[in-house]
Amino acid sequence: MNTATGVIALLVLATVIGCIEAEDTRADLQGGEAAEKVFRRSPTCIPSGQPCPYNENCCSQSCTFKENETGNTVKRCD
């Protein structure tokens, strides 16, 4: 088996595996197990001290104006 044949075989294998995984995470309109796989995310709240562009999504549920290291006033999660 030469290099080109090996590369083609790996591409075919990757495509087959990708199709199998895509089937496993197909959208489930009833909100079942497949939907949980598709919408699996990391925590969405913003930790304390980080900039908060909106008054929501802070882990503390509070966002206030604070002075940063350059002297500008920015909104940060409490």
Swiss-Prot record:
Gene Ontology terms describing biological process: defense response
Domain of life where this protein originates: Eukaryota
Molecular-function GO term, any one: sodium channel regulator activity
Signal as UniProt keyword: yes
Tissue: Expressed by the venom gland.
Similarity comment: Belongs to the neurotoxin 08 (Shiva) family. 01 (omega toxin) subfamily.
Function field: Insecticidal toxin that reversibly and voltage-independently blocks both mid-low- (M-LVA) and high-voltage-activated (HVA) calcium channels (Cav) in cockroach DUM neurons. Also causes a modest block of insect sodium channel currents (Nav). Induces potent excitatory symptoms, followed by flaccid paralysis leading to death in house crickets.
Protein name from the UniProt record: Omega-hexatoxin-Ar1f
Organism: Atrax robustus
